[in-house]
Amino acid sequence: MAKSNEGLGTGLRTRHLTMMGLGSAIGAGLFLGTGVGIRAAGPAVLLAYIIAGAIVVLVMQMLGEMAAARPASGSFSRYGEDAFGHWAGFSLGWLYWFMLIMVMGAEMTGAAAIMGAWFGVEPWIPSLVCVVFFAVVNLVAVRGFGEFEYWFAFIKVAVIIAFLIIGIALIFGWLPGSTFVGTSNFIGDHGFMPNGISGVAAGLLAVAFAFGGIEIVTIAAAESDKPREAISLAVRAVIWRISVFYLGSVLVITFLMPYESINGADTAAESPFTQILAMANIPGTVGFMEAIIVLALLSAFNAQIYATSRLVFSMANRQDAPRVFSKLSTSHVPTNAVLLSMFFAFVSVGLQYWNPAGLLDFLLNAVGGCLIVVWAMITLSQLKLRKELQANDEISTVRMWAHPWLGILTLVLLAGLVALMLGDAASRSQVYSVAIVYGFLVLLSFVTVNSPLRGGRTPSDLN
């Protein structure tokens, strides 16, 4: 199938997509949240990361197969519609848009709190400046977004590699003042699995969503000059990112720190990354990690403005959103869609400070389960579309392994994750909240199918 980006630009290069593939999931969740999983499972959190990582690798391989065959700015929303019709594309697109909008607010609030403390100003000031700045970056041309994400990702990858090198040197006692630690912390008095299988299950719930946002690379690929090559490289990078960056970081932390001394971090000073850099007598570690955390949050925010605008643009072209959002500027940027993302970024940030009757709690709970729905629908879409893609000779650079068995295994693993969430009092509300939100969107898709928004066409007309 010929490349189709619906009139968008082609300013992204393979290097942009490859670096995005490496760095897109290296965020504040890794630097601040890793300790939550370690505290729950001890060193056995590695098993939780392996299980969660396997799910993500399989999902991305399936998504990569469809994206390489049919590059589209709507990505999995478009493939859901191709596979199951209007209801799937509509509900999946708006669900992911909702998820990113809510996460945008939380991330900007976190970054603004740190920057406000730096400059001695109210957090809303850096928040306003950053939202406007990244909106402008995304309004000018897609190349600007790509360059920012390239360098954001480059810095994050460089920091993780430096952390791994320093950590290994500390483990083997190669740095001044350090001694060989062996497995005294990794095994210690409590063993590899101090809290048993239940601890690993709790750890899995803590780390399962650490890889969220990885799907954005397939949205961006539609604006690449070589989408199939870019998608192939980005999908392959997923395995390296999980095995080296996540598993490597957790190995270093669990070898150097007793698991019972590790907790989830609310500040950079509490991050296990900061504490390990301090072991190496590196000065200014707290300030350095604060800067890296801010960079990670702003990188995610920039990517989410981009992804939400392209999703709305794609849905507008498919008549699942008002047509005004399909308008392109002379530089092939969906200006109105970017402005919509900017507006809701302000709304989402505002909700972080003004929480009417628990609305924010409900919305953020729904976000926790959105990824499971998205990953499940990606899997179902690939299982449904594979025969059609083969018949049309569309499968090219990326092919799902052991089809359909690994796809079925992915669904089983996702079902198991849902079962764990239902069995956990803290996670149960996430399942209920996303079920309400997604059910509402599915119903809305049937209500709007013959609305003026779609020009009175039926799904079969659109196909």
Curated annotation (Swiss-Prot):
<comment type="similarity">
    <text>Belongs to the amino acid-polyamine-organocation (APC) superfamily. Amino acid transporter (AAT) (TC 2.A.3.1) family.</text>
</comment>
<dbReference type="GO" id="GO:0005886">
    <property type="term" value="C:plasma membrane"/>
</dbReference>
<comment type="function">
    <text>Permease that is involved in the active transport across the cytoplasmic membrane of all three aromatic amino acids, phenylalanine, tyrosine and tryptophan.</text>
</comment>
<feature type="transmembrane region" description="Helical">
    <location>
        <begin position="18"/>
        <end position="38"/>
    </location>
</feature>
<feature type="transmembrane region" description="Helical">
    <location>
        <begin position="40"/>
        <end position="60"/>
    </location>
</feature>
<keyword id="KW-0812">Transmembrane</keyword>
<dbReference type="InterPro" id="IPR004841">
    <property type="entry name" value="AA-permease/SLC12A_dom"/>
</dbReference>
<keyword id="KW-0472">Membrane</keyword>
<feature type="transmembrane region" description="Helical">
    <location>
        <begin position="157"/>
        <end position="177"/>
    </location>
</feature>
<feature type="transmembrane region" description="Helical">
    <location>
        <begin position="276"/>
        <end position="296"/>
    </location>
</feature>
<protein>
    <recommendedName>
        <fullName>Aromatic amino acid transport protein AroP</fullName>
    </recommendedName>
</protein>
<feature type="transmembrane region" description="Helical">
    <location>
        <begin position="117"/>
        <end position="137"/>
    </location>
</feature>
<dbReference type="GO" id="GO:0006865">
    <property type="term" value="P:amino acid transport"/>
</dbReference>
<feature type="transmembrane region" description="Helical">
    <location>
        <begin position="358"/>
        <end position="378"/>
    </location>
</feature>
<feature type="transmembrane region" description="Helical">
    <location>
        <begin position="237"/>
        <end position="257"/>
    </location>
</feature>
<dbReference type="InterPro" id="IPR004840">
    <property type="entry name" value="Amino_acid_permease_CS"/>
</dbReference>
<feature type="transmembrane region" description="Helical">
    <location>
        <begin position="402"/>
        <end position="422"/>
    </location>
</feature>
<keyword id="KW-1003">Cell membrane</keyword>
<keyword id="KW-0813">Transport</keyword>
<keyword id="KW-0029">Amino-acid transport</keyword>
<dbReference type="GO" id="GO:0055085">
    <property type="term" value="P:transmembrane transport"/>
</dbReference>
<feature type="transmembrane region" description="Helical">
    <location>
        <begin position="84"/>
        <end position="104"/>
    </location>
</feature>
<feature type="transmembrane region" description="Helical">
    <location>
        <begin position="431"/>
        <end position="451"/>
    </location>
</feature>
<keyword id="KW-1133">Transmembrane helix</keyword>
<feature type="transmembrane region" description="Helical">
    <location>
        <begin position="337"/>
        <end position="357"/>
    </location>
</feature>
<feature type="transmembrane region" description="Helical">
    <location>
        <begin position="200"/>
        <end position="220"/>
    </location>
</feature>
<dbReference type="Pfam" id="PF00324">
    <property type="entry name" value="AA_permease"/>
</dbReference>
